[in-house]
A protein has these predicted regions:
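Anionic-ligand binding patches
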Residues: 1-151
Length: 151
């Protein structure tokens, strides 16, 4: 694991590029302000357990914190065999971490990630609506625009 989402996405996308193909990859996670942007690149294995364990640890670490602001981050990388047009794009979705889980849809930290414009957690939002505003959808839109510029 690299130290940043950018490093990880580039590392993943570099594998096909070494074989002569265009490599496209992403890395994503949750960054919580009060925890110095943790879990960050370690989001999937924050607790060493599953999603429930990760959520439990996050709640425990935020127990006495007043600042519960957080963001989901997705970085997409495109690596070319000749490295002439390599790029990354970053999508972010800002919210806050609730004190208890709400909703059952989604995965990961979605039951704790409150998105104010919809007044719901990501686990309570319809998937189509979530896909309009998520960090991944923002990154994908930026990625498509960048590809159009290059091609």
């Amino acid at each position: 694991t690299g130290e940043t989402f950018e490093e990880n996405a580039i590392t993943k996308a570099s594998v096909p590029a070494k074989l002569g193909y265009i490599g496209i990859a992403d890395d994503s996670g949750l960054c919580v302000s009060a925890l110095n942007e943790a879990p960050g690149v370690y989001s999937a294995r924050y607790s060493g357990g599953d999603d429930e364990d990760n959520n439990d640890l996050l709640l425990k670490e935020l127990e006495n914190k007043t600042d519960r602001s957080a963001k989901y981050v997705c970085v997409m990388a495109c690596v070319f065999p000749d490295h002439q047009n390599d790029f990354t794009v970053r999508g972010e979705c800002h919210g806050e971490i609730l004190k208890e889980r709400h909703g059952t849809a989604g995965f990961g930290y979605d039951p704790l990630f409150y998105y104010q414009p919809f007044d719901k957690t990501f686990a309570e939002i319809d998937l189509a609506k979530k896909n309009e505003v998520s960090h991944r959808s923002i990154a994908i839109k930026k990625f498509v625009e960048k590809i159009k510029e290059i091609m």
